[in-house]
From Swiss-Prot:
Gene Ontology BP annotations: protein insertion into ER membrane
Protein name: Golgi to ER traffic protein 4 homolog
Gene Ontology CC: BAT3 complex; cytosol
Domain of life: Eukaryota
Family in the record: Belongs to the GET4 family.
Known function: May play a role in insertion of tail-anchored proteins into the endoplasmic reticulum membrane.
Coiled-coil portions: none
Amino acid sequence: MSAAETGPIASGSAVSTGQRGVSRVLAKLSQSLAGGEFYEAHMMYRTLYFRYTAQKRYQDCLELLFDGAQQLIAKEQESSAADLCLLLVDTLEKRGPQAEDTDNFLWVPRLGALIRGLNSATVERETLIQRTIKWSTALHGQYGHPVLHKLIAHVFWTEGNIESARHHYLLCQDGSLCGRVLIEISQSRGFQGEMDLFLVQAVLQQLSLKDRKTAEDTFTEYTRYHAKLLKHEFPYKEPLVNFLYFLFRLIDAKRVAGFRALRKLYDPSLKRDTSFLKYVAKIGVLYFDEHPEAAHSGPPGLGGMFGDIFNRLMAGFEEDDADDHDTTLRRQNENNELE
């Protein structure tokens, strides 16, 4: 028999042997889980991960790791479960986005459920959250999938980690929900004179992230239902709330002169928080074609993932606008006619 004839036979034999090997490992894996040998089970999951990914059997690998992580979480083996979760994200990255959007989205709630199942004391959980968000940017923009942010926000909120929850709620593109969350935070943690600050910071951040619709939905929910605001419709008693009201309308009208006048008029109020003027400067670049200012390190108090997002926003002023410099100058000349 020629080599050409024996080649396919040899290849088929190797595949068959490999499948038998996987079957044996799966059988031992079930026994280890049933017998409480969780470290051994963890190692076998890793072995199967390497075999499946080497064979590009990504779907089999994903289902195996998801099931394994769930089982280990149920057995309170959270460190091992977190490791499988990280391998699952790694497999999703190796596989890449699929043509079927429904399959891509399937893993957003699944990963959210796994994150929810891990205790906050699990060391690897923060790494898992960051890796999962990074993976989801391939599905939805540079800040990650909004549904994933909502699921993560719920986890932090349930644990009482209000600041981390707030950051993720701001990125979930659900302004009504964000407004309700901010109301609860301000009523439980803020003083009467700070009721407007919670709203203003959130709305300016959302506008800086080019999420105008969510920003206005947040504004509407907060001003309509916050019990301690002195008025619930324009004109408001709080100067900064009026500032936001005017800002939305100037963005829609693209009135550069009006924006500059508004910023000057409310400058004393904006100085109540050092971050506000930096956000307003970014908004000027995004919506009114103003020159970017020098890069900032970001306002104090924005740590973690959202702080990184803010730093990328602010540091990207000059770099992002370099290619569009001539266009910006032309637009500014046109806008000068409005002054």
